[in-house]
Structures are given as C-alpha cells and as structure tokens.
Design a protein with these regions (language model features):
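Long, C-terminal-biased catalytic regions of enzyme "large/alpha" subunits
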Residues: 1-89
C-alpha cells in the first residue's frame, strides 16, 4: 500500500509508524510500558491490510482503525482497544 484515504477524501502516503504510534498511545493511556507489543500488533494489522488490499489498494482510515481494534481485542488487549476507540472519536 502506498496511500490511505483520509476522512476528508484526500490521499495521503501510507505510514505504518502512524499505526504503531496510535496503538502505543492507547496502550500508555492504560498503563502499558512495552512498545514492542504495539509494534507486534501493528505488524499484524499490516499483514491483514496487505492480504486485503495488496500493493495497489487504498484502505480508508476507518478500515485501518477497524482492523486495529479487532487485532487488539484478539490479542487480549481489550483495555487498549477501548482507549483506542475513545481516541479515534
């Protein structure tokens, strides 16, 4: 993926680090201290995005966020998922 479709319908370069940072901020809000967990979940999100969209697909911000929430919950990070959901509103 090279781009992401923002809420204002603009295309922006895709940057996995933004996903990792958002997960890490949510984790820290819940007392998290291990950024490697945020990176691991971010890598899982990337794998799912790659599988779904391939190299040329363009996911929306909302689609990415939905996958992040799902992966956080699947990995037992329900509190972080809740903080992430509250952050995205």
């Amino acid at each position: 993926m090279k781009f992401v479709l923002k809420r204002d319908s603009k295309l922006e370069p895709f940057d996995q680090e933004r996903i990792t940072t958002a997960i890490w901020k949510a984790a820290k809000a819940c007392g998290g201290t291990d950024k490697t967990q945020a990176k691991r979940v971010s890598d899982e999100v990337m794998a799912e995005l790659q599988k779904t969209y391939g190299d040329d697909g363009v996911p929306t911000v909302e689609e990415i966020q939905d996958i992040v929430e799902k992966r956080l919950i699947e990995n037992g990070h329900a509190q972080t998922a809740k903080a992430y959901i509250l952050y995205r509103k």
